[in-house]
Amino acid sequence: MLKIQEMMQIALMTAIMGILGLIPPIFFTFTPVPITLQTAGLLLAGGLLKPKQAWMSLLLFLLIVAAGAPLLSGGRGGIGVFFGPSGGFLLAYPIAAFVISWWLNRLKKMTALRLFAVYALCSIGILYICGVPFQAMMMHIEVKQAALLSMIYVPGDLIKAGICSVFTVKIIQAMSYRKREIHKGGRAI
């Protein structure tokens, strides 16, 4: 059974994913998969939540999108988005968030550099392993060709991984400080 605080964290991360969907995507003429900031939300979910919570927040987000809410970048929503070229990437979101969180929970010390490595490996590795073959199938092209088309996204994914790793460390430090203040009798504002 989830605690209320855990449910709130799941809901908050789901809302953040929806808010990031309001930022317009960047499309290229040669590939139908857009560049979005929602992968940054995936990274933050994995970095800030427990594995089960991270998985649940992204699954909840995808269920809301499947129900028709236009929360994906560009106002996309509905079950049809999962049968398009970006469907494999989307379906990999909960898996990637879970693996990121699971991996980070096993680190003895969390630094921005270690976070960056985990974020980059998981976001590029898991999302592309699931997304590229699905994209190839939907576009009726070879997997090798889809992989080459997807290489345009790697620099942006690395930039997002770097920015999110710094944000995650700062958020965790702020939360740890806040917890110390509460335990000392300070006010939680």
Could you tell me what each predicted segment is?
Residues G21-P34, L62-A96:
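Interfacial aromatic-anchored transmembrane helix boundaries in multi-pass membrane proteins
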Residues M7-L12, T36, A40, L44, ...:
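Hydrophobic alpha-helical transmembrane segments
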Residues M1-W55:
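Hydrophobic transmembrane alpha-helices
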Residues G75, K109-G185, I189:
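Membrane-embedded alpha-helical hairpins and interfacial helices in multi-pass inner-membrane proteins
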